[in-house]
A protein has these predicted regions:
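C-terminal domain-boundary segment and adjacent tail
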Residues: 24-28, 53, 61, 68, ...
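Bacterial N-terminal signal peptides
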Residues: 8-17
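Bacterial N-terminal signal peptides that target proteins for export
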Residues: 1-9
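A Trp-anchored, charged/polar loop motif used as the substrate-binding/catalytic surface
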Residues: 172-183
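Metal-dependent polysaccharide deacetylase catalytic core of the NodB/CE4 family, i.e.
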Residues: 30-33, 52-148, 152-166, 189-200
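Sec/Tat signal peptide C-region and signal peptidase I cleavage site
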Residues: 19-22
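Boundary/entry segment of secreted carbohydrate-active catalytic domains
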Residues: 24-46
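Autoprocessing Asn-cyclization modules and mimics
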Residues: 200-270
Length: 307
């Protein structure tokens, strides 16, 4: 039977309306962005204020044996991060190379770390592999206790990504490189996960006298600033100083003095400032890509339709 011209026109109109329907948001989501901090350093609690001020969230991957130790988060700080909208992830108990362990030990690391965090009143659904290392045996056990697990890989994630092999980029103190990676993720409508460890400021020190002590207060003159020393043996070798700003803004040329050690030196140049870089990154995302959602791992999995 031949179709009438009116029927053909109606069918074409119907097909055109179907073709113009929006794509399924689960299979073609807008770009997503997740920022993570590995190991549970106490600086997570400090930098969380910058995220809160800009209406953003992040994730902290906590190694439970380190909770409450020097330079690491306390139980109260971990709960505070969760209350601020951050997601807390397990990073095992002792931070081992999981693929080198036998199955019973892997199971113990993954199960007990989650139980210990939950005993603090923290909701835990995902894991971060120490050193970004896993294998089939590790993945199999991770599936028993977690919704997902993150490694490295320097590539983007999509709805097709294996949730127990989430990929990520390590932040290398290069804000320009990070912005270029954000640009690529947005263009590809991908999920970009970025991680780093401790947050601090690194500067060169000239005419150093004595050795600064980790944990001591540093005084900067004439700027009048104060900071918490995060010195290490490597800092001494390379002639640098790492610190956590407390008040003011230290400037090049300041005389730096340790309150306890009385060590001193002249502040040369700023090598990197993680706090300024994170603030700049969040402003860049908000201004350039307002529709690129800043999410936790759990939220990203939900938006991609990953169970």
């Amino acid at each position: 039977m031949r179709s009438s011209p009116r029927l053909a026109a109606a069918l074409l109109a119907l097909l055109g309306s179907v073709a113009s329907l929006p794509a399924d948001p689960v299979t073609t989501p807008a770009a997503l962005f997740t920022y993570m901090f590995d190991d549970g350093f106490s600086t997570d609690a400090v930098v969380s204020r910058e995220f809160s001020e800009q209406g953003a969230v992040a994730c902290s991957a906590v190694t439970t044996d380190w909770i409450g130790t020097r330079s690491h988060l306390s139980a109260a700080e971990i709960r505070g991060l969760q209350e601020a909208g951050w997601e807390i992830l397990s990073h095992t108990r002792t931070h081992p190379h999981l693929p080198r362990l036998r199955a019973p030990r892997i199971e113990e690391e993954l199960r007990l770390s989650r139980e210990e965090l939950e005993a603090l009143g923290v909701r835990v659904r995902s894991l971060v592999y120490p050193y970004n290392q896993s294998n089939a045996a590790v993945e199999r056990i991770a599936r028993t206790y977690y919704r997902s697990a993150r490694g490295g890989g320097y590539s983007f994630d999509t709805s097709a990504t294996n949730p127990y092999a989430l990929r990520s980029f390590s932040y290398s103190h290069d804000p320009e490189a990070l912005r270029r990676t954000i640009d690529r993720a947005y263009a590809e409508k991908a999920w970009l996960i970025v991680y780093q460890h401790r947050v601090d400021v690194a500067v060169t020190i000239e005419s150093r006298r004595g050795s600064f002590v980790p944990g001591e207060i540093l005084e900067f003159s004439p700027s009048g600033s104060e900071a918490l020393c995060q010195e290490s043996a490597w800092s001494q070798i390379f002639g640098t100083l790492h610190f956590l700003p407390l008040t003011g803004s230290p400037r090049a040329g300041d005389l730096v003095t340790g309150q306890r050690s009385r060590a001193s030196g002249k502040l040369g140049r700023i090598i990197f400032d993680d706090f300024a870089a994170i603030a700049g990154m969040l402003k860049y995302l908000r201004s350039r890509y307002p529709d690129m959602r800043i999410v936790t791992i759990d939220q990203g999995l939900d938006l991609l339709g990953i169970p």
